[in-house]
A protein has these predicted regions:
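Glycine/Thr-rich phosphate-binding loops that ligate phosphate moieties of nucleotide
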Residues: 1-177
Length: 177
C-alpha cells in the first residue's frame, strides 16, 4: 500500500475528474440513508492509476471535509491544531497531505499516528483511570500523552487545496447517482 499511496500524490490535484464514494452504510452529513460504494468517471476524465488511488484517498476524507466546512465556514469554529491519527497516516506524509488539502489546515502527526483505534481506545481508558486532576480530555492529552511531542506538521499547498475543492464540488454534484 505504501507504493500505491505515494504514487497517488503524483496524480492530478483534482483526481483528473474521477470520483469515488466509499459509503458502506448511510451518511447523514450527505443525506444518504443507505451506502453504495461507487467509482465514477466520464469519458474525458484522466483515468490512470495515480488519479484512481488519489480519488480513493480523497473519498476517505470527503465527508470530513463537508462537515468541517460547516464547522469552520458556517459555525465559525476555530481550532488550535489538528492532529491526525489512525490508519490513513500509516504511509508517512500521504494521509497528512490529503487531509491538509481537504480542510485547508496544517496537520500534525506523531510517531504513533498509524496505530489506529486500539491505541485511541487505550488513551480514553487511561483518561478515565488516571485523570486525578479532573482535566478536560484535551488538557489530559496535552499534559500526559503528547508532552513535548508537537509531531511533524505538513501545511497544505495552494494547488492541493484548489484540487480538493474541485474534487469535493464534483463529489457533491454526483451524490444523486
Amino acid at each position: 500500500y505504501g507504493k500505491l499511496c505515494n504514487h497517488a500524490l503524483t496524480g492530478n490535484a483534482d483526481c483528473g475528474g474521477l470520483i469515488s464514494y466509499n459509503y458502506i452504510s448511510g451518511e447523514p452529513i450527505t443525506g444518504l440513508a443507505d451506502g453504495r460504494p461507487l467509482f465514477v468517471r466520464s469519458a474525458n476524465d484522466k483515468f490512470n492509476l495515480a488519479n484512481f488511488m488519489r480519488t480513493h484517498l480523497y473519498a476517505s476524507v470527503g465527508v470530513l471535509k463537508i462537515g468541517n466546512d460547516i464547522l469552520f465556514n458556517e459555525e465559525k469554529i476555530k481550532v488550535d491544531r489538528i492532529t491526525g491519527h489512525g490508519g490513513l497516516f500509516k504511509t508517512k506524509g500521504v494521509g497528512q497531505r490529503i487531509l491538509a488539502a481537504a480542510i485547508n489546515s496544517p496537520i500534525s502527526v506523531m510517531e504513533t499516528a498509524g496505530e489506529g483505534g486500539a491505541w485511541g481506545i487505550a488513551l480514553l481508558g487511561s483518561y478515565l483511570v488516571n485523570n486525578e486532576k479532573k482535566q478536560s480530555l484535551a488538557d489530559f492529552l496535552e499534559d500526559k500523552v503528547f508532552t513535548g511531542d508537537a509531531g511533524i506538521e505538513i501545511s497544505p499547498t495552494a494547488e492541493d487545496v484548489a484540487g480538493f475543492n474541485t474534487y469535493i464540488e464534483n463529489y457533491k454534484a454526483g451524490l444523486p447517482v
